[in-house]
Curated annotation (Swiss-Prot):
<feature type="binding site">
    <location>
        <position position="92"/>
    </location>
    <ligand>
        <name>substrate</name>
    </ligand>
</feature>
<feature type="active site" description="Proton donor">
    <location>
        <position position="140"/>
    </location>
</feature>
<dbReference type="GO" id="GO:0042802">
    <property type="term" value="F:identical protein binding"/>
</dbReference>
<dbReference type="InterPro" id="IPR051016">
    <property type="entry name" value="Diverse_Substrate_AcTransf"/>
</dbReference>
<feature type="binding site">
    <location>
        <begin position="102"/>
        <end position="107"/>
    </location>
    <ligand>
        <name>acetyl-CoA</name>
    </ligand>
</feature>
<keyword id="KW-0963">Cytoplasm</keyword>
<dbReference type="GO" id="GO:0042127">
    <property type="term" value="P:regulation of cell population proliferation"/>
</dbReference>
<dbReference type="GO" id="GO:0008080">
    <property type="term" value="F:N-acetyltransferase activity"/>
</dbReference>
<comment type="similarity">
    <text>Belongs to the acetyltransferase family.</text>
</comment>
<keyword id="KW-0012">Acyltransferase</keyword>
<feature type="binding site">
    <location>
        <position position="152"/>
    </location>
    <ligand>
        <name>substrate</name>
    </ligand>
</feature>
<keyword id="KW-0808">Transferase</keyword>
<dbReference type="GO" id="GO:0019809">
    <property type="term" value="F:spermidine binding"/>
</dbReference>
<feature type="binding site">
    <location>
        <begin position="27"/>
        <end position="28"/>
    </location>
    <ligand>
        <name>substrate</name>
    </ligand>
</feature>
<feature type="domain" description="N-acetyltransferase">
    <location>
        <begin position="4"/>
        <end position="170"/>
    </location>
</feature>
<comment type="subunit">
    <text>Homodimer.</text>
</comment>
<comment type="function">
    <text>Enzyme which catalyzes the acetylation of polyamines. Substrate specificity: norspermidine = spermidine &gt;&gt; spermine &gt; N(1)-acetylspermine. This highly regulated enzyme allows a fine attenuation of the intracellular concentration of polyamines. Also involved in the regulation of polyamine transport out of cells. Also acts on 1,3-diaminopropane and 1,5-diaminopentane.</text>
</comment>
Amino acid sequence: MAKFKIRPATASDCSDILRLIKELAKYEYMEDQVMLTEKDLLEDGFGEHPFYHCLIAEVPKEHWTPEGHSIVGFAMYYFTYDPWIGKLLYLEDFFVMSDYRGFGIGSEILKNLSQVAMKCRCSSMHFLVAEWNEPSINFYKRRGASDLSSEEGWRLFKIDKEYLLKMAAEE
């Protein structure tokens, strides 16, 4: 399959973006953790101050999925800032449906993301990969990615909403 198009997502793509988010979560054995709704995606990504940006991979009608979907991959990203090196593109989610892997779609999405990062004068692109996900780790390493957890010893933490509320209410 040589024909596919990578383009910025539009508000009308939110249902497909959510479908792919759920497919990615299932692939990562975390499907029960997706709480986001299509409405959330619409408000958070396509309002006056979007919290995220998204590229999608779209195939022509002759290559649609058996369920009739033309959108077969996506990359959700946002910009952040590192006080040591400046602007960063943070790749939050990146997924190509399994039947559409091996056709260069993922490589083209990553190329487009790299172009966005360079256009915005970002110093680097950061992202997380599950430790067990060797295919993705190898995909990124072949393109020059370095594993900061093993090379620099960084650990990722999170503070859930209940604890944010608790800290915010402290006097």
